[in-house]
Amino acid sequence: MTHCTVPLRLQLTAAVAAAVSLAAASYAAEVNPAAMIYKTPDQFTWRDPTDKATTNNTVLYGDPNGTGLYIYINKFKPGRFGLPHYHPNDRFITVIDGAGWRGTGTVVDPEHAVRLPKGSFSIDHAQKVHWDGTKEENGAYLIAGYGPATNIEVPKGIGPYAGGDPTSLTLKTPDQIEWKNNAGNRTANLVGDPSKTGLYVQMLTWLKGDHFSRPHSHPNDRFIFVLSGTWWAGTGTTFDPANLAIPLKAGSFATHFAKQVHWDGARDEDAALLIIGEGPATNTPAEAGK
């Protein structure tokens, strides 16, 4: 019997080629646009494309000047504070980068502002005067609510600062957010109740270690922003994370369309998501192959 010995160098080359081919196949996965659409941060359209302005914004969904649900991002350069103002409707705000400083009342006093680092959540209550800004760090907010989200300025008060109005803002730093541990993930309901009718805002963290949901659908659209980590998402009834899931990095934004089948989760790192929608967000399992 003749034995053919393959040189170690060729064996290693073949192994590397196979690994690269496998990785390429995995990353070449696509999702069904009827079930899910997404944008990576480099695909966002900013008001100031040069990003030189002190403040900048991009609308992800809806129209803040209209009357329906809207979602947009405001970002700020360091060292700026706005004037006191209010909005006609509640606004729900997640700090997605840097840190914001927030206060209430007509006297803008940065020394009495509350620092909200990345991962914090706040509510601007309707008709209540508040102000915010940045100090040494930049800041970015993801803001959601029902429009119009008009910014109505009020005359700036003359000091001294008298304590503001505690009913104007609801503020939660990351350590104040209450989480519920589930199998493979943890959730925090920030606004509303996903099981009931009405607007809800929820944080969901998929835990690392190949934790995934199985194919399912929801009765209403859901809007997802990746806060940190890499989120893996797929569509259709075939559950195959190794070959059919796409990776969405932090800062990406996606829509899961109503009654369309999808699945998602995390691989080798936690994936933290912000989910916004109108309930109920019932999870309906899909039948394989249908």
Where are these regions (language model features)?
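Bacterial N-terminal signal peptides that target proteins for export
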Residues: 2-14
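Short acidic-glycine-tyrosine-enriched beta hairpin
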Residues: 63-66, 100, 106-128, 193, ...
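N-terminal post-signal-peptidase region of extra-cytosolic proteins
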Residues: 57-60, 71-80, 109, 188-189, ...
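A short, N-terminal "cap"/entry segment at the start of jelly-roll beta-barrel domains
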Residues: 27-70, 151-200, 288-290
